[in-house]
């Protein structure tokens, strides 16, 4: 690739993107929003396991969210590219606030005294299902807005800080979720979640309007909807990066079983659950901040493969551990390696995607990557029921290593990729 091309005109200032006021507003709003959602997901996993005492029930939480998220992802990308993105994002945050408010109502003593545990659990699944539809719009909208807040030479730096903000929020949300469940209970934790979502809404209102960009010619709706998918399949580096991450997360979804490990194997309680749930993200944020100041200069493709392989090994170690400190350390290192994967994949997507297709390509990315988290949660729950909790997590780690080997052989363009 030509060293003078726009892709390679990358700033060496680690704080370049942070100096842009609108980018700071986007990061602050996204931080608050993601922190609230991670608190809610931590709470829901613990709450459902407390109601059912069944690992498979945790898996069904993921399935409840992923079915609508995948089903609507392509159409959501089409709508995002045709819409004013700031308004669309604010609507998504509003609907998430409504979902959290409904969960808050379900947690009250009135509902607990008038409905069975099964009915409450089904109600939780229904709310998560609806939030999956909203998620198919909000996640890609954030990604599409990102590129319009910074100049192109700042994209790698902005992507790194964006992932750092996301991971910091995830760490804080997971840890605070466990801490608040233990100290103030489920209902008051949900009040906190609702408050954070309201704050995120008002912060994101400070963004400038983001109108749709001109599209290349008139297209039928279905043709436009599938254009992002066709673009990803034509762009080999992007397809390989998405596929590698998707299958690694799908089979390496050990975090889905953290409630079981915390409660039944490690005897760590809600507080330990919160820290174990946050361990992967703590590791990831450390490496992402490190990469912001010391970015990878070459061989990013090979480093991506090594990182995902190391992630699989850490998952196996976590599965076999019966000591809290070792379990936390295994997840922490897994998070560091996952952080490398996140930065490389995110940068590849931002650099390879045309501006007028960012919504659709981001939606395809959400189908590949984000939805694999919930599918991995379901796979982990199903495997735990069939094989037992520990063997199922070992199996997931081994499958991650197999995926790395297959992708290494089948995707030489990603293996050789540099930016």
Residue ranges and their predicted role:
Residues 99, 118-128, 132, 157-214, ...:
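Hydrophobic alpha-helical transmembrane segments
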Residues 105-126, 319-331:
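Helix-loop junctions at membrane interfaces in 12-TM secondary transporters
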Residues 2-11, 205-230, 419:
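Flexible cytoplasmic inter-helical loops of multi-pass small-molecule transporters
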Residues 61, 71-75, 82, 86-88, ...:
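C-terminal transmembrane bundle of multi-pass solute transporters/carriers
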Residues 8-68, 230-280:
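Helix-loop boundary and gating motifs at the non-cytosolic
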